[in-house]
Design a protein with these regions (language model features):
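C-terminal motif of bacterial Sec signal peptides marking the signal peptidase cleavage site
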Residues: 16-19
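Short coil-to-beta strand junction motifs in C2/discoidin
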Residues: 60-69
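Short amphipathic, basic-aromatic surface patches that mediate peripheral association
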Residues: 47-59
């Protein structure tokens, strides 16, 4: 009798432990399915730039190409406090504490450019700078997009016009 009771306790313990493992497996699988269905993790930053015919005008109104840099940042404090000249000449030094990655491209008048890069895990913001010939005192040459506003499916679409960089008015931040 005692052996049977002891055997039943051992069997019950094994079943209980197996059930815990099965429950954990089901719970993990359910969580993974939820994440895959309702939350798309952004692993790639896609940026599409479109330039109007009249960008970066000189003194007589002739358009010129513009250098655009895209920064992956942990925070925006150093980016927003940095001057145009600081970002132009020593961006890596000025942004060192927040900088995750940096890419640059040239955009021509009435042209377009696209960029695709791996999104670094600690990136919380995307900072974009267009280095115009004659940057005005306003921050129209600089733009910040929070990571939460990006789409896993659509690129971040930006427009260059005159001496400004902006998100199109006819669509959301994600393009």
């Amino acid at each position: 009798m005692r052996v049977i009771a002891l055997s039943m306790v051992v069997v019950a313990s094994c079943l209980l432990l197996s059930a815990c493992g099965a429950w954990q497996t089901v719970s993990t699988a359910t969580s993974s399915a939820y994440q895959a269905t309702f939350y798309k993790k952004i692993t790639v930053l896609n940026v599409d730039l479109k330039a109007r015919a009249m960008i970066n005008p000189d003194e007589v109104g002739r358009p010129y190409s513009v250098v655009v840099r895209v920064y992956q940042l942990r925070d925006t404090k150093t980016f927003t406090s940095a001057s145009y000249d600081d970002l132009l000449t020593k961006d890596k030094t000025v942004l060192a504490q927040d900088l995750q990655d940096i890419r640059g491209m040239v955009v021509y008048p009435n042209g377009a450019a696209s960029m695709s890069q791996a999104l670094k895990p600690n990136t919380q913001y995307i900072g974009i700078v267009a280095f115009y010939r004659d940057a005005k005192s306003s921050d129209s040459w600089r733009l910040i997009v929070p990571k939460k506003d990006l789409s896993a499916d659509d690129p971040l679409v930006l427009e260059l016009e005159g001496d400004s960089i902006m998100q199109p008015k006819d669509g959301p931040a994600r393009g």
